[in-house]
Structures are given as structure tokens and as C-alpha cells.
Amino acid sequence: MVKSQNITWHDSEVTKNERQEKNGHKSVVLWFTGLSGSGKSTISVALEKALFERGVRSYRLDGDNIRHGLNNNLGFSPEDRKENIRRIGEVSKLLSDAGLITLTAFISPYREDRDHVREILEDGEFVEVYTKASVAACEERDPKQLYKKVRAGEIKNFTGIDAPYEAPEDPEIIVDTEENSVEEAVEQIIQYLEDQKVI
């Protein structure tokens, strides 16, 4: 629900197409989704570096980082998770309008919320990247010791354990992080971007 009234959208004199032309690549949002520990942040960090080294203008939005500032007033209830993704979707749209390739690393457990972000972007701009890994594999990795805390009863409503995760039905990219290395995942995504003539 929009609460703001008496507001006007101010158009820029620089178009998205002009920005893309200047940058030498198209703008897309690479939306990494998957369980905690599935590799979203690890792969997006490596991909951001690889794109930077190729001269591609990109920016990474990470779930934990965003909750330190923009979304520090949100918890992990279903309503707060929904608002978290709504805000990130709007920020991603702004970065896309700026002509950047945006990398987002968010569990984003609800399909409906990811679909909403797809809808607010232009056709072809939302690229869903499913970092596929089983709960068992993620729990074995447990880079933040979150699964350990869940099992000890210290964390409730944890995605994949006692809160749902709705896996993508038809993502543009599936990265099986149980079978592929970070380097292989980065190569796979860059190949997709080249094949789609984004870069």
C-alpha cells in the first residue's frame, strides 16, 4: 500500500539505454536464491570480482549486509521477509536503471516475492540463479554456524528447517553447488551472460 501522497516522478535526461551503451553492456539483475550455506554470497562475491576484472560495471547486494542498514528494522517473520525482498527489488530496479549488472544474494524463500521482483523489472532483466544444495550439504558447510544454533534451539523460523523454502520452478540458471566449484559456477554464469548478449 502506497502511503505517500502528492508525489511526482522526475524523469532523467539520461536514458537507461544511453547508460548501457556507455557501459558497453546491458543491465540485468542476477537474483541468487537458495538455502543458507548454498553458496549465494560466495559465488556472487567471486562473480563480482570476475566482472570487475572484465570492465563490467556491477554491484552486489548481500542479505546480511543489507540488514545492517537499509533493512535493519526487519526481522525474519514471513511479513518481514516479504518486505525485505520488496525493498531489495526496488533497489535492484534503481541499479538496473543506472545501467549496472546487479548481483543479489538473498535466501528469498517465497516464490511469490521473487516473482514480484521479476514483474517490476523489464522483460529479460531478472535472471534467477538457483544455488542448488541439499539441506544436509548446507548444514555440513554451516559457514555461519547457523544450523548448529538451530539444532541447539537458539534460532527459530530458519529456512529449510522449520520455515519453508520454495525452490524456483523455472530459473534461468541452476548452479549445483554440491557438484560444481565456485570457479565453475562463475564460468557458468558468465557464459550465460555472454550467450544472452548481456556482456
Curated annotation (Swiss-Prot):
<feature type="active site" description="Phosphoserine intermediate">
    <location>
        <position position="108"/>
    </location>
</feature>
<keyword id="KW-0067">ATP-binding</keyword>
<feature type="binding site">
    <location>
        <begin position="34"/>
        <end position="41"/>
    </location>
    <ligand>
        <name>ATP</name>
    </ligand>
</feature>
<keyword id="KW-0597">Phosphoprotein</keyword>
<keyword id="KW-0808">Transferase</keyword>
<keyword id="KW-0547">Nucleotide-binding</keyword>
<comment type="pathway">
    <text>Sulfur metabolism; hydrogen sulfide biosynthesis; sulfite from sulfate: step 2/3.</text>
</comment>
<dbReference type="Pfam" id="PF01583">
    <property type="entry name" value="APS_kinase"/>
</dbReference>
<dbReference type="GO" id="GO:0070814">
    <property type="term" value="P:hydrogen sulfide biosynthetic process"/>
</dbReference>
<comment type="function">
    <text>Catalyzes the synthesis of activated sulfate.</text>
</comment>
<dbReference type="GO" id="GO:0004020">
    <property type="term" value="F:adenylylsulfate kinase activity"/>
</dbReference>
<comment type="similarity">
    <text>Belongs to the APS kinase family.</text>
</comment>
<dbReference type="GO" id="GO:0005524">
    <property type="term" value="F:ATP binding"/>
</dbReference>
<dbReference type="InterPro" id="IPR002891">
    <property type="entry name" value="APS_kinase"/>
</dbReference>
<dbReference type="GO" id="GO:0000103">
    <property type="term" value="P:sulfate assimilation"/>
</dbReference>
<keyword id="KW-0418">Kinase</keyword>
<protein>
    <recommendedName>
        <fullName>Adenylyl-sulfate kinase</fullName>
        <ecNumber>2.7.1.25</ecNumber>
    </recommendedName>
</protein>
<dbReference type="InterPro" id="IPR027417">
    <property type="entry name" value="P-loop_NTPase"/>
</dbReference>
